[in-house]
């Protein structure tokens, strides 16, 4: 500490601060390897320190807010590496229905950006681009809300992988316990569920009831859930009309989705081939 002792010395000058009316101090400080003597007002310096602390606090608040909102998408989404590289910009329009689909998603963009509340559903056969569209929308909304300085928490989750991870958590702590995932998926501002219905098996009633209970817990505590599925509306009602659901779960799935459902024709070709 001895080598810094010289920098703690100060001399009170006759000069007066025009703002605070107090005497200036002459202090010695190291600047770029040299000891420089400068004049400063102690009250001005206090104000500078307070402004600096306020700025640090603001930056800390922004980082904390982004951690709870914008960063959720990249940190907590459950998505394949192949799909994670997709966006709405690289969605290829091959037939008329593709253009209708992209226009539907763009309408969802505008509505959700304006504060619209309610679910949305995209349904159709495998391979028509449902996951690409919904992931692209999730990615776009996440960036859009940040650009408005109103970041939201947006989460995209593969339903099949989600339940695989929850089942794995019964054997070891993988960070995907049922309680943790229900809480996370219930609380995000926008939840995208990829391939809803794939978590269920026709012949496994006990497994289905467990899975349906989890889906119900999630949807019962939230709005703004965007779903893609291979199931038609009638198939959704049939699948989730078990002893537990009794129609309540399918009601949660369709909640607020009037006018926000898009259906691909059943005979469409798989885009992946």
Spell out what each predicted region is.
Residues 1-99, 271-273:
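A short, basic N-terminal segment
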Residues 90-120:
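Pre-Walker A (pre-P-loop) alpha-helix and adjacent loop at the N terminus of AAA/AAA+ ATPase modules
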Residues 99-105, 142-187:
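Short glycine-rich substrate-engagement loop in P-loop NTPases that contacts/grips substrate
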Residues 116-135:
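Walker A/P-loop nucleotide-binding motif
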Residues 118, 153, 187-190, 221-227:
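Loop/turn-to-beta-strand initiation segments
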Residues 135-141:
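GG-anchored amphipathic helix commonly corresponding to the ABC/SMC/Rad50 NBD signature/C-loop
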């Amino acid at each position: 500490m001895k080598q810094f002792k010289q920098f703690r010395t100060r001399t009170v000058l006759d000069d007066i601060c025009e703002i605070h009316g107090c005497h200036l101090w002459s202090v010695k400080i190291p600047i770029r390897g040299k000891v420089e003597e400068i004049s400063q007002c102690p009250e001005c310096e206090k104000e500078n320190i307070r402004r600096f602390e306020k700025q640090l606090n603001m930056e800390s608040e922004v980082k904390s807010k982004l951690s709870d909102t914008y960063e959720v998408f990249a940190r907590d989404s459950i998505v394949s590496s192949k799909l994670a590289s997709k966006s709405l910009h690289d969605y290829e329009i091959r037939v008329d229905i593709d253009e209708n689909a992209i226009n539907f998603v763009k309408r969802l963009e505008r509505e959700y950006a304006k504060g619209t509340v309610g679910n949305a559903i995209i349904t159709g056969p495998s391979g028509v681009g449902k996951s690409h569209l919904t992931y692209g929308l999730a990615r776009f909304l996440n960036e859009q809300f940040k650009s408005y300085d109103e970041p939201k928490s947006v989460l995209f989750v593969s339903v099949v992988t989600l339940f695989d991870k929850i089942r794995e958590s019964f054997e070891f702590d993988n960070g995907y316990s049922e309680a943790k995932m229900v809480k996370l998926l219930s609380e995000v501002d926008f939840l995208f569920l990829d391939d809803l219905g794939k978590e269920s098996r026709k012949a496994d009633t006990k497994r289905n009831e467990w899975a349906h209970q989890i889906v119900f817990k999630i949807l019962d505590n939230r709005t703004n859930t965007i779903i893609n599925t291979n199931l038609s509306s009638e198939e959704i009602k049939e699948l989730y009309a078990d002893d537990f659901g009794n129609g309540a779960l399918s009601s949660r799935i369709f909640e607020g989705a009037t006018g926000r459902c898009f259906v691909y024709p059943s005979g469409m070709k798989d885009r992946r081939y």
